[in-house]
Swiss-Prot record:
Pfam families: Oxidored_q6. The gene is nuoB. NDH-1 shuttles electrons from NADH, via FMN and iron-sulfur (Fe-S) centers, to quinones in the respiratory chain. Couples the redox reaction to proton translocation (for every two electrons transferred, four hydrogen ions are translocated across the cytoplasmic membrane), and thus conserves the redox energy in a proton gradient. This is NADH-quinone oxidoreductase subunit B. SUPFAM superfamilies: HydA/Nqo6-like (SSF56770). InterPro entries: NADH_UbQ_OxRdtase-like_20kDa, NADH_UQ_OxRdtase_20Kd_su. Its EC number is 7.1.1.-. GO terms for cellular component: plasma membrane; respiratory chain complex I. It comes from the Bacteria.
Amino acid sequence: MASDLTPHAGMAGRATVPGYDPKKHDPFFDGVSDALADKGFVVAAADDLVTWARTGSLMWMTFGLACCAVEMMQASMPRYDVERFGFAPRASPRQSDVMIVAGTLTNKMAPALRKVYDQMPEPRYVISMGSCANGGGYYHYSYSVVRGCDRIVPVDIYVPGCPPTAEALVYGILQLQKKIRREGSIER
């Protein structure tokens, strides 16, 4: 018999977290499943449907500025595989919902960060990853460092650490999805 981590036909080559079942962690999905089993069709508010779809299909754009970007890349690798949460990378800001600012933001780079943020479609979200992006970090007193990317763009989730682990970034992504579900409106 295969263990929880042994790949089998249903896994399509992906590693899973033992004991994690996405169906158990999404109350909207539970309601949809119950309604389908009971009546054969679902009646739901369009706002709830859009919010549910939005949390399961977030496209992220990297803004890797320093060593935190290495941990951000690791979160996309097979061990953590953030795409299983519907969090897929995109290279263009016009196709992205989330920007991950990872690393030290300098005064010279700040206008480029704002320009890329302005090119993202609404609703857009920002994850600040690492001590340098959160508040300047080790280089806080340098003349050329912005003391937190929240001075340039509005930040939704802060991921602490120097550098934060890939697990911390995955937790931040899950918190962003929870925040989007809590807001629950089409307009942000």
